[in-house]
Amino acid sequence: MTQTKINADAIRAMKVRGEKIAALTAYDFPMAKLLDEAGIPIILVGDSLGMVVLGYPDTTHVTMAEMEHHVRAAARAKPCALLGADMPYRSYETPETAVKNAKRLAAVGAEFVKAEGGREIIGQVRAIITAGIPFCGHLGMLPQHVLEEGGKYHIKGRDDAGRMKLFDDAAALADAGAFAIVLEIVTPPVAKELTKALSIPTIGIGSGQDCDGQILVTPDLIGMFPWFTPRFVKPKVYCAAEIKSAVAAWKNFVQSPGGAQ
């Protein structure tokens, strides 16, 4: 059965219907194809690729050229899912650079872009949307700011000041025209309040089960990056172990008398 192409309006409509939104990351053609065939409505080419694909210590090392390369690969899957891309570190410091770089990502297949921050980037958000590119916000723990926070990932919304900032930033993003907001490592009660208060979908990661949807880094979900797994992730399968087992079995076969393939 042919699937219908999903756009930002369809994602907003899912919140209206009370339908939970499942989103995952892909960094290449085969994973984008598999996720699309599994019916995932949002596929994000995340800057998490810096850590789980390129071996960087954090996402601040990812470049625009690297994002373009991986978006182009994922876009070749021609997914029915809405395909988005993270704007990498320092690629949206002014409205002008934000639009220029969002257009670069759109040119290689991104159907929306996501950037970290709230009221402080509203000028950039408005400029991107005015340029005709759908925008998804990202609040809570901001991986691109990890070095500014001493290299630690901190839970957000624990105190009144943090809660008020989240509400202010979320309202600003919604007013600017964002079609959805990712909430990363926000205290579940605050994430639940934000979800009820906003007319646009919230997509949680490590923020409890009361958001309008959930997103995970796919290698975390499938146990493909065993060297680090966030505490809030429970892998559904352990692909890394399966790969090592298969490789070891093949190696033994090759090295056995008469082994060939």
Which residues does each PLM region occupy?
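Alpha/beta enzyme core
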Residues: 2-261
